[in-house]
């Protein structure tokens, strides 16, 4: 009889411990959802990245947040985890950065290069697509196969489609500036020099 009571007490203790852990997790998730509601780091429809998961927020419940990833997978992240991890909210960006090197060929002259830099800088500064105070355009490098112009600006459009449309238009307009100044984009190339001239062979018909 005494052994049976001991077993019953042991079972109750294990059950109580399991319930305590379950309650702890549940309370942590409820607290996490409360933090999300109060702090508002994101809302339904936002594009976020947190704890290795990136996608669009579809639903926020007391237990978890549902995120639709770009491969269209549905990931449920516990709110307790989200409330204690860094969150990147891409939707809340006010502007987006464009940065690239524009490589032109080595036969570009000093005057051409100077004009290119000035024209691109003036174009971007006056463009409605970007913030004028963020524009940087400089002749920067003598690279292996190109003379590099360093270009940086921030677009006013922060959503993906708007950003890509702005970047496309900027690329097309810079291409036109290159054409107007008689310059060409460079590509990797190799020059081979022979110490002695190669003999040319001809076939007699």
Per-segment meaning from a language model:
Residues 35-131:
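Soluble accessory domains appended to multi-pass membrane transport proteins
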Residues 1-25, 31, 35:
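Hydrophobic alpha-helical transmembrane segments and their immediate juxtamembrane helical boundaries
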Residues 27-30, 80, 201-205:
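Short, structured secondary-structure boundary patches
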Residues 13, 52-55, 141:
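Transmembrane helix-bundle signature of multi-pass membrane transporters/permeases
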Residues 3, 72, 77, 82-85, ...:
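Residue-level signal for pocket-adjacent positions within structured domains
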Residues 88-90, 96-99, 104-205:
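Solvent-exposed, non-transmembrane regulatory segments of membrane-associated proteins
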